[in-house]
């Protein structure tokens, strides 16, 4: 039985690593050295730290996992995740841990495989833009922006990895008539 538990833990570890490696926010932080010169090592350490966190805390709530991951990214990579991916990654990790607790190695393998297949290669490049305030003056305001592109199997997409469309019929959609001329969107309450 100890062999099966070790196998399940190894599968959980592989799933955690797959989820973190597929996380665009972490990819960008590592690729751009937000964690300093040891960003790659910190990313590898992060997988072990997350695994240990789950092993020490068997009954974690989703918000606790989100807080832990957010705190690690803030402290280790000086990165605040605001793209909505933090709850998704936290949910994936929590689901994998539930499979681990039940000893469901097949589900762990399937989740890790699915995450790896959907993994996108994310690159962020700094763009320099300059606007002249007056054509006669040489003063230039420069702004540094980041352009993020994601590719999955060679196909480039803007922003983040494609996600499945929500199947909830009650999901709120923005209609063209709700967008007014000045760019504001009218938000209506559900009836």
UniProtKB/Swiss-Prot annotation:
An example of a Gene Ontology cellular component annotation for this protein is:
nucleus
Chain positions covered by the region annotation Disordered: 149-172
What are the record keywords, sorted? Diamond-Blackfan anemia, Disease variant, rRNA processing
A Gene Ontology annotation in the biological process aspect, one of them, is:
maturation of SSU-rRNA from tricistronic rRNA transcript (SSU-rRNA, 5.8S rRNA, LSU-rRNA)
Q: What does this protein do?
A: May be involved in 20S pre-rRNA processing.
The entry's family comment says: Belongs to the TSR2 family.
UniProt disease annotation: Diamond-Blackfan anemia 14, with mandibulofacial dysostosis: A form of Diamond-Blackfan anemia, a congenital non-regenerative hypoplastic anemia that usually presents early in infancy. Diamond-Blackfan anemia is characterized by a moderate to severe macrocytic anemia, erythroblastopenia, and an increased risk of malignancy. 30 to 40% of Diamond-Blackfan anemia patients present with short stature and congenital anomalies, the most frequent being craniofacial (Pierre-Robin syndrome and cleft palate), thumb and urogenital anomalies.
Q: What is this protein called?
A: Pre-rRNA-processing protein TSR2 homolog
